Design a protein with these regions (language model features):
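Metal-dependent catalytic core segments for phosphate chemistry
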Residues: 213, 220-266, 381-389
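Short, conserved charged micro-motifs
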Residues: 447-459
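Conserved "right-hand" nucleotidyltransferase catalytic core of DNA-directed polymerases
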Residues: 1-198, 204, 208-210, 217-220, ...
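A common structural junction motif
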Residues: 460-472
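Hydrophobic (often cysteine-bearing) scaffold residues that line and stabilize catalytic clefts
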Residues: 12, 220, 240, 244, ...
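Short hydrophobic/aromatic beta-strand micro-patches
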Residues: 441-445
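Conserved catalytic core of nucleic-acid polymerases
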Residues: 44-51, 162-167, 171-174, 255-257, ...
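Short secondary-structure boundary/capping segments
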Residues: 102-104, 185-189, 227-231, 450, ...
């Protein structure tokens, strides 16, 4: 290699330090010293992750590529049958002609007024309106495009010569502290942060290891609760309730006649939400949902107060995930494929239940922006300045800033603490392989489990990942869920039986060890040899869809 490149690289590094020294006083004076220090601390563990990479199961990758191609072909065949001819889902012209000319639908337009049949337009066409039923063809086109994107973006990724997936990680890739990831300098790898579940199934632990994922539970929702001080949100967290069930139950309560509201308890309503979730599951067809509810002697009495196209628990989940940052009804309807009138109703109910979000949290953020020169500072010391034009878009960005940055900063502090703990990463030989905003992926030697040491290691990791935070005089931590499995995707009994499975709360070391052995399919006392073949078991499945 040319010596000029080495000299250039050395000068580049030296100049960076000279620049740092020149502006260091300004960095500290402006309050960005914490952010600088936290970023520098991340470099060594990030370099480890980028160097280590994750093993690929190529056989399973090839099998699922075939399955996705078959699913795409089946969707195309159904689309052609409905259209009465071959319809190219990838052709904007053909798709626009089909819906806007042949079917007579009023054209949807993009931001600059141009006619479009992009994903948002297709979602609206598939959803339908009060005057027009939804169209199956639009959903099929979305699915076909999704399958093709999955094939092109993830099934054709260039891997490194050692059959591992690596990514370049930028610790300052986003405004609020989240990492951004992409291809390496060698042109291999991909964006790990946006990786679909279908692909994660082919990322597997090295021989003699299993995967353990630590995931912060309802993390941003918890932060919003403590910033806002909303009594109902705090009640959910501090009593260990299911927030999606509770939100659904309170939405149901708000719609009941006053005399009936006085007769039922919160537990009664939560039981109805759980029953509805069991009966409806993930169905979205309004007619089938109504039929199932009318067949149940309990649900038929309250069906008129339940959402038409999903279970009430699913409604609570979508509201919890989407409405803390002032999402408006049109976007909520589009993202969740429901009618705008339903979206308006859900949003009104949500903010009636959790009034502290708008009255306390949003009002406080606006006040802080005005008082502190458009700047917010999270509980760890990260300062975020907003330079956009005053208005709804700036406020929405600011509402999300503190919860997002608080979660990722708390996680990254724990990430560094774990990496620097010699017992965990060197004596026990755990590898940290990935960070995805609110979770960490580890590969753990099977010997750590079979020797009975996993419980203590897991608890140490949980402690590192649970720093005490404070907003408005309210101190709190965010609970951590533990998942174990033989690949990085979520467990499904049919589609991915070897995937990550969440462990319930355990009362003792013995119970924890028994549960992990059972979840991984390792017979206690069988040793490492009996477990080594688990990760290479069949992962063949029919994909649920690219969307």
């Amino acid at each position: 290699m040319d010596d000029k490149l080495f000299v250039y690289n050395a000068l580049d590094g030296a100049c960076t330090f000279e620049i740092r020294d020149a502006i260091w006083n300004d960095i500290k004076a402006d309050g960005y010293g914490w952010t600088y220090g936290a970023t520098i601390r991340l470099f060594e563990p990030l370099i480890f992750m980028m160097t280590r990479g994750i093993k690929i199961n190529h056989e399973a990758l090839a099998e699922t590529k075939q399955d996705i191609q078959a699913a795409s072909a089946a969707a195309q065949a159904e689309l052609n049958k409905l259209a009465g001819r071959e319809l190219n889902a990838q052709s904007p012209k053909q798709v626009q002609t089909y819906f806007y000319v042949e079917k007579g639908i009023d054209p949807y337009r993009g931001k600059e007024g141009q006619i479009t049949a992009d994903d948002k337009a297709l979602a609206r066409i598939a959803r339908g309106t009060a005057r027009r039923p939804g169209m199956r063809e639009a959903r099929l086109i979305q699915d076909i495009r999704g399958y093709e994107k999955l094939l092109g973006s993830y099934m054709e990724i260039a891997f490194d010569p050692d059959d591992r997936l690596r990514a370049a990680i930028n610790p300052r890739g986003t405004k609020f502290g989240r990492f951004s990831t992409g291809k390496t300098v060698f042109g291999t790898g991909c964006n790990l942060q946006a990786m679909p579940q279908e692909f994660k199934k082919f990322l597997v632990p090295d021989d003699g290891y299993f995967f353990m994922e630590k995931d912060k539970r309802q993390a941003e929702w918890v932060v919003v609760a403590y910033i806002s001080g909303d009594a109902r949100m705090l009640h959910v967290i501090e009593n260990g309730l299911d927030p999606h069930v509770y939100t659904g139950a309170m939405m149901l309560r708000e719609q009941l006649p006053p005399d009936l509201q006085r007769q039922v308890t919160d537990k009664d309503l939560e039981d109805i939400v759980r029953l509805d979730s069991k009966v409806i599951g993930m169905l979205t067809d309004a007619d089938e949902i109504l039929q199932r509810r009318m067949a149940d002697k309990t649900l038929r009495n309250v069906y008129q107060f339940l959402p038409r196209t999903m279970s009430i628990r699913q409604c609570g989940k979508k509201a919890n995930h989407g409405l803390n940052y002032d999402e408006q009804y049109r976007m909520f309807a589009l993202m969740n494929e429901i009618q705008e009138s339903e979206a308006m109703k859900i949003i009104k109910l949500y903010h009636r239940i959790y009034s502290g979000i708008q009255h306390n949290f949003h009002a406080w953020v606006k006040q802080q922006l005005s008082k502190s020169g458009r700047t917010l500072t999270n509980c760890f010391g990260r300062r975020i300045r907003f330079l956009d034009e005053w208005g709804p878009d700036l406020y929405k960005s600011a509402y999300s800033a503190l919860p997002q940055s608080t979660v990722v900063d708390g996680l990254n502090i724990g990430f560094c603490d774990i990496y620097e703990d010699d017992y965990i990463t060197r004596t026990m030989n755990l590898d940290i392989l990935a960070q995805t905003h609110d979770s960490l992926l580890f590969q753990v030697p099977i010997t750590v489990l079979t020797s009975g040491k996993l419980y203590d290691v897991s608890r140490s990791i949980d402690k590192y990942l649970s720093p005490t935070m404070e907003y408005g005089g309210r101190k709190f931590t965010i609970a951590t869920d533990t998942k174990v499995g033989w690949n990085w995707s979520g467990m499904h009994k049919d589609r991915n039986p070897l995937g990550l499975q969440e462990l319930p709360e355990c009362r003792s070391k013995l119970e924890f060890n028994q549960l992990v052995h059972h979840t991984l399919g390792i017979r206690q006392g069988s040793g490492v040899a009996a477990a080594r073949n688990m990760a290479s078991g069949s992962t063949r499945s029919t994909p649920a869809g690219a969307r």
